[in-house]
Amino acid sequence: RCRVTFCFSIYHIVMFIEEKKIDELIKISHIAGNEILRIYNTKITKKIKKDRSPVTNADIAANKIICREIRKLYPEIPVISEESKKVDLRKRKTFWLIDPLDGTKEFLKRNGEFTVNIALITNKKPIFGIIYMPINSIVYFTKNKKSYSGKVKSNGTLSKVKVIKTKKRK
């Protein structure tokens, strides 16, 4: 029995992430990555959060883009982000988990070692995810229990997609 306004089985969530929406989610990560790179190549401003980790204007800008666009695609699924207000995850069965700029310290060093991360979590397990590397336009994502990598073209579409062979966990 559900105690929240919506309840989805893992099957229904996976069905929500159809091919077209995967492409749109990759495009969202690409748009956020472009904004990160724009700031990377201009002026970076930094603040220190309560947990003593840095947050930049690129973190905030990418966060706004990703959260806004995911809410348009999936208004019924909450979005939780590292850069948003803290939310009690125990109350959330299914949610989007976003790290708009993973590797802020590396971003500040301007070494190119940072990513945009988007994951869908259900029952405390990731069931879909995207890792996008803006510096070289490489994306890694999961779909139908398989992992893929590809190059994101300037218009946000995928090319050179290949399956990544992974070992099964014991």
Where are these regions (language model features)?
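Glycine-rich, Arg-bearing micro-motifs that act as flexible, cationic patches
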Residues: L108
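N-terminal subdomain of lithium-sensitive/metallo-dependent phosphomonoesterases centered on the IMPase/IPPase/PAP
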Residues: Y11-L101
